[in-house]
């Protein structure tokens, strides 16, 4: 509200989060959509795009290059978005949240069984999940990341104190 009162535009960077929270936009999940003036999306859309309110609409020709897409990428992105919109991916009971609950549940189950006490604080939001390995130190995080990579799983580090392992889950996962 302060930014609105001061005429400061609010920019939502949804490059990573677009469609990954159970809503199309993370700002919808956070309940702050009314304050967003500019929003960038990519990845799931198969294209980088900048969305904006009428007030911040740029003059023709101002956006180009990086923000442009090829016809095949735009077509693929549209199909993906249509599928997510019409095939039950979005919403609190949608496939995105089901994948989240299943994956976090599996991490917690690992912590209770074969990896007893080695994985802590599994959680996150939608298709973005993180877990704290071992004691949460940088050294343990690095060792686990290298071991996961060596075994064919690409994961990323995040956080500090504790250091965590993050997963960007694909929306096509199933229990099978």
Language-model features: locations:
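Conserved N-terminal phosphate-binding loop of PLP-dependent enzymes in the Aspartate aminotransferase
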Residues: 1-176
